């Protein structure tokens, strides 16, 4: 019984930190902005925080789940087609290293998330304190083409499929279980494999700000200047 109580408190603390980070990020959004909305449990707290501000926003969602949740709160969501740049994109993370490398994609939407992040003038990552790590660890999410899948898996090595999981765009979702102490090298390995649509390693230069909630406080790591 005591063990269960401690575990529940820990979960409550994590959820509180997700909310704190999300609310801090919502303050970065200006009225009239074109906003990229990520996917995941931390973004779930961002949506009501944005809705409560009552801003006039034009949003692009990275998954059907985020799009549906945003619309339910009265947030305008539009297709990404025809939108060349976003003012800001906000998303969660699975792991955040001290040097700014980030792992994303536990939910299988990392290809869309990476496209949206790259299109944003300012990409902001939000997370609870348990996502801050000393060294990145496997697994690293991958989206793969179904064509030539066995050859791709053989070239990648140490990669397992997530059963029948598919991305929002139909790609095969897999996880790389090899060492990732050198994220730049691992990223290059993925990029050199033709069957890899996208991977969950996000380099430091892609991110402008990281907001990590620690209790009621928010640690703000500035990684890069927002694009002009």
Model-flagged regions — what are they?
Residues 2-16, 65-228:
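Conserved phosphate- and dinucleotide-binding cores of soluble alpha/beta proteins
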Residues 47-56, 71-75:
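Glycine-rich loop at the start of a catalytic domain that most often binds anionic cofactors/ligands
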Residues 18-24:
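A short, well-structured juxtamembrane/interface segment
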Residues 37-42:
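Glycine-rich beta-strand-to-loop/alpha-helix junction loops that act as flexible
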Residues 32-35, 54-59, 101:
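Short active-site oxyanion
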Residues 25-30:
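Glycine-rich helix-loop-beta junction characteristic of Rossmann-like nucleotide cofactor-binding loops
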Residues 10, 32, 50-53, 138:
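A short, structure-level motif marking secondary-structure boundaries and short turns
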């Amino acid at each position: 019984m005591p063990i269960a109580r401690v575990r529940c408190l820990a979960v409550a603390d994590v959820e509180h930190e997700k909310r704190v980070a999300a609310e801090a990020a919502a303050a970065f959004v200006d009225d009239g902005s074109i906003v990229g909305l990520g996917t995941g449990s931390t973004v779930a707290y961002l949506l009501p925080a944005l809705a409560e501000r009552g801003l006039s926003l034009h949003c692009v969602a990275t998954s059907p789940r985020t799009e549906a949740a945003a619309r339910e709160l009265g947030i305008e969501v539009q297709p990404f087609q025809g939108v060349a740049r976003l003012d800001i994109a906000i998303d969660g993370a699975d792991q955040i290293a001290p040097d700014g490398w980030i792992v994303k994609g536990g939910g299988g939407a990392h290809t869309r998330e990476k496209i949206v992040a790259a299109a944003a003038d300012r990409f902001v990552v939000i997370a609870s304190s348990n996502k801050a790590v000393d060294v990145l660890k496997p697994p690293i999410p991958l989206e793969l083409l179904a064509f030539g899948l066995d050859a791709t898996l053989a070239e990648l090595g140490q990669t397992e499929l997530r059963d029948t999981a598919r991305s929002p765009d139909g790609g095969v979702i897999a996880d790389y279980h090899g060492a990732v102490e050198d994220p730049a090298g691992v990223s290059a390995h993925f990029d050199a494999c033709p069957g890899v649509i996208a991977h969950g390693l996000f380099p430091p230069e892609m991110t402008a700000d990281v907001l990590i909630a620690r209790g009621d406080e928010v640690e703000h790591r500035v990684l890069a200047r927002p694009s002009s």
